[in-house]
């Protein structure tokens, strides 16, 4: 039973169910998905007992942002200090975690955290991501001042990951509220964002990639590093707009002072061959329109009178 529930097919199904359930109940001025990242200075605040979680880690895959974590049990002094720290940001993503199922206990929302959310909505552009029961919105003041509100229904790792992707347009918004939140949102509320504008992150099985092949990539990278071919690298594989492999190996330099991270940002120079010329040549070769045994000047006649006239396409 355990193996069946945790098989690749079962996980893919669960991911699809979660993805289709995520509900954007409010989106003032169309802030979500975030478009002009160059105009946004984003902070991500997790009201959580954890120092860092998958939600924030996934957000960081899309842009540079500052992460803050504070437990719901923190006192007003700490929450107010955090509000002061957030003044320099023009967009604040607040994710609410570790909720419970008890209405009598306000679904685990502490008075301090509720006060914090209200005060923050008065001062900042707030995007709220509620990882729990939508009825909890009844206890949250200031929703009318928030830019966007996403209801995610539970706090699982998959839900956290996909919620972050939705905010940046990695996946569309399709869900609708199954219940009404008194005086705030009616049953069936749910803004539809049918188009994805950025890469989606998922598991290899979603694109039918074979894990044993991906393990070979790991081995090649690690072997190259051990042989001194390069100090480190990041390898990312995408199919149909879905990232199914994204790993970092080794260090940036041979002195091993800084590890390579999947969150590192690189200069995008010298990628034309990889992302343009090579795929185009592969397509033409597959259509029998390019003979790689011929000379380049057979296709680019202006090279015929240069010192490049003997270069073979291959």
Regions found by a protein language model. Give the residues of each.
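Short amphipathic alpha-helical face segments that pack within enzyme cores
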Residues: 162, 274-280
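Active-site helix/loop module of the DD-peptidase/beta-lactamase fold
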Residues: 267-271, 284-314
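Short, basic/aromatic recognition patches
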Residues: 206-226
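A short, well-structured edge-of-sheet supersecondary motif
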Residues: 225-259, 292
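Short alpha-helical transmembrane interface motifs in multi-pass membrane proteins
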Residues: 262-265
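Short linear capping/connector segments at secondary-structure termini
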Residues: 1-4, 251-253, 295-302
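Preference for extracellular/luminal or secreted protein segments
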Residues: 1-206, 210
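Solvent-exposed, non-membrane alpha-helical residues enriched in polar/charged side chains
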Residues: 218, 222, 281-282, 297
